[in-house]
Amino acid sequence: MKKVTFVIQGPLCIDSIRNIPNYKRLGDVVVSCWDTDSPELFELIPDYVTVVKNKFIDPQDYNFQNIRYQIKTTLEGIKEVQTPYIVKVRSDEYFTRMNNFVSCVYNFPEHITVSNFLFRKKYMFHPSDHVFGGTVGNIARMLEFSLEMIGDFYRDEKVDVERVGLSKKYTFPILTAEMTFCLSYLKTKGIDVVADIQGMSFKELKEYHKKTIKENYKLVRASDMGYFLLRFKSNPIIEEPTAFTNEQDFLNFHIGSIKSLEEL
């Protein structure tokens, strides 16, 4: 019996559909997409895949970085999961060899496993959210807490981090999906970051951040996940890439990504 389910979430994309057999070798597969997706793409999904066709929503609430879309499709996909573990992947990305990632999820069930793509050293509480894995319960609770966290924000609002109790001195200035998921995941572990860091010096904060992330996250490098496609669609500079297929390219990219949690 398989112990992990890959939940491919988001609008259907040929890139992830053609990679489904690679996921199937390791576990079950659920595709959670939208009822507005191309019928031709639905026909390409193998019969062994569970498909969740969500009614497309035009959210009137906060949806910066499409966070509400990501939460909606992932949670709806989780409802169809019959295994104790889940790996969430974006529908516009793929990884051809997930053995190391899945092994990490199995070996460290009380952690959340992520990749190093855009896992930035410069900003605290900003782990990558492109692919993540863990127990079904932990991932679901993280997403539910995230919905609560963004519940009072407006549709097109960009939220300054000060509004959630953090500071631009050490975090990204705008509340991102990555930060929302991080604070929410730590909350599932009984960790209240905002309360904990009150009155800390920068040195104490840096030590707290590294210790907290290392105790609750595991990292698998993209170079250990076979051939891959990772997107950076929000890149505002048109002369720069919006996708990466080589780890060294994004390690050299000016935004920066770590190779190990020891770099934090």
Where do the model's predicted regions map?
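Short, well-formed alpha-helical segments that are part of the catalytic scaffolds
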Residues: 12-25
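Active-site-proximal specificity loops/subdomain of glycosyltransferases
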Residues: 32-80
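Active-site acidic Asp-centered loop
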Residues: 34, 89-91
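Catalytic core and acceptor-binding pocket of nucleotide-sugar-dependent glycosyltransferases
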Residues: 95-98, 112-262
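Short aromatic/hydrophobic "clamp" motif used to bind/position activated sugar donors
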Residues: 86
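N-proximal low-complexity "stem/linker" segments adjacent to membrane-targeting elements
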Residues: 1-15
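Acidic donor-binding/catalytic loop of UDP-sugar-dependent glycosyltransferases
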Residues: 71, 91-105
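Short, polar loop motifs at secondary-structure junctions
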Residues: 11-13, 33-40, 116-120
